[in-house]
Amino acid sequence: MSDNEKTTQPASTDSTEPAYRYNAALAQDIEGKWQKIWDDKGTFWAANVNGDLKDGKGRNADGRPAYFAMDMFPYPSGKGLHVGHPLGYLASDVVSRYHRMKGENVLHAMGYDAFGLPAEQYAVQTGQHPRVTTLANIANMSRQLHRMGLSFDDRRSFATIDPGYVRWTQWIFSRIYDSWYDEDAVNPSGSKGSARPVSELVAKFESGEKAIPGHESDGKAWADLDQAEQQDILNDFRLAYISKSPVNWCPGLGTVLANEEVTAEGKSERGNFPVFQRELRQWSMRITKYGHRLIEDLDGIDWPEKVKLMQRNWIGESHGASVHFTVATADGSKDMEIYTTRPDTLFGTTFAVVSPEHHLLENVPAEWPADVPEDWKGGYATPVEAVKAYRLAAEAKTAKDRVDEGGEKTGLFTGLYATNPITGAKLPLFTADYVLMDYGTGAIMAVPGGDQRDYDFAVKFGLPVIYTVKPLPESGDDLANYEGKAPFVSHDGIVINSSVEATAAKGDALSLNGLRVDDAIAKVNAWLESAGVGKGTVSYRLRDWLFSRQRYWGEPFPIVYGEDGTPHLLPDSALPISLPDVPDYEPRTFDPMDAESNPEAPLSRNEDWVKVELDLGDGKKTDRKSTRLNSSHITRSRMPSSA
């Protein structure tokens, strides 16, 4: 007699246990019996409108109400599930069963977010190939989920490493890459702004309907530009584009990390390695183009107001102006664009600051200008030495450390000067790590009379402070309470010290004195646009999404490069581009403290896969997409019409 049979027999007369005691073994028998019945009858099967996927009664969808229940996919980066997984799955299972009992056609399926750093790191730690460990972990997780009795339609289970899923991930990337955001496009709802094919943008350039950036005054037509020039221009419009971006470089892991993968201490979440800020060539998604739409669409969702407010603040829409300053260098005048929410304070700008990653720092002079205070130089003999050392120091800090309000304000003079387009004043140009390259333009105009951070910086380096706003008369406050002690920080007040008889850009008179702040902003924005040195614009705290990694375990980009380095999109017929099985899949790692090291993608060592001969060109891209891209279309791939 088996142990199970023994536990289901009546207890003997001398036993203290009740007959047919409900214990773990009996529970397992009952669960196993009903799970087999559910499997045999297809109790949890969802029916498609047509095709082979029918419900347990052999029916296609027949007009019954449809209900879609979705769970967050587990990462198969460990041998099995942990206790946190069923916490969410049980809740969605209760909801699914409720709607199924109401007679609805319920689609409730499970999948596995199988690419990415966690799965690859697990494989490295266990000394196996990621595909081997991932498939083994998926099999065990599937067994565990089934054993829990959750009402999934297992016929529809998939993993993000499946070729069919990879194909659609790459197809989605192709559509994003081949699109641009047309702010003037009219949507069916009457609103403006929509993604349009890049071919339409090219047609606008060819017809002259849209000016070609950088060629507004030289008369060049689109056909006059070579292919590389055309692609550089289109790259500035594509929704998926190549950028030189400040990134979290982790030499110890040999890869770039997302902000979420970096701890508050500036270490990698995996392995606890130091993380440095580096500027590298990366793939980015132009999500900032959708900033305003994201805010507007929050009104249409049934979320708590507190959560929606957090989202609005995270997107961070602000209205201001972009302003162009001229910077004189040995290589000629260079443009420095800044974004400010307070263009009315342009008269109070006494210095400017750029990020350590800013391109202008490639043009610093060989020697210090005359009469530069010693504390501006940071102890260095030349601007070149000073900038190089400061850049290295900035790389060792996280973005969070750099913008910490309580931290010490560091910086040094670059040897360059920027010209104020209104007053013509020569503003010393500093570099400071509290200015981030991927926020705004990586350059700021400093107004110490109206900003605490600028005031602290000005005091430290002995820079002048000009107040351009005074309190309203009815406020009971007085500017004398601030002068020489602190900035007057207020969006409202009366503008002062803001008049010039002849502007630097136009030679006309301009005065903002006596105006309220909002009126002064409107007036100066109009002047900036008329002078061709700026315009009113909108900026976002939200940043474009960097989504490439120098790892092996992920989908390759469907991009090849020509001999001239020009990227070409592979046709849909070539998809999916699958990962080759390689013996050496680990990225090259470096000394964890080697901030100057450069990433080496594992696939770059696979010459047979990297080099291809096509009419498009040769040299397949060796970066791959991060896990977040293949996770972000899970909903669509599981919808009934897509199954």
Model-derived features: positions:
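Residue patterns forming the tRNA-binding/recognition surfaces of aminoacyl-tRNA synthetases
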Residues: 2-27, 32-33, 37-41, 126-336, ...
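Conserved oxyanion/phosphate-binding beta-strand-loop segments in alpha/beta enzyme cores
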Residues: 2-10, 15-70, 100-109, 133-139, ...
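Flexible, glycine/threonine-enriched loop-and-boundary segments that flank and lead into catalytic domains
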Residues: 52-54, 306-337, 394-430, 545, ...
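N-terminal catalytic cores of NTP/NDP-binding nucleotidyl/phosphoryl-transfer enzymes
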Residues: 52-134, 158-169, 338-341, 345, ...
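Conserved active-site neighborhood of enzyme catalytic/cofactor-binding cores
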Residues: 65, 74-110, 268, 369-379, ...
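Catalytic alpha/beta core of large soluble enzyme barrels
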Residues: 92-93, 105, 358, 362-471, ...
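Nucleotide/phosphate-binding sheet-loop regions of phosphoryl- and nucleotidyl-transfer enzymes
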Residues: 275-277, 284-288, 292, 347-382, ...
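Single conserved hydrophobic/aromatic residue that forms the stacking wall/gate
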Residues: 629-643
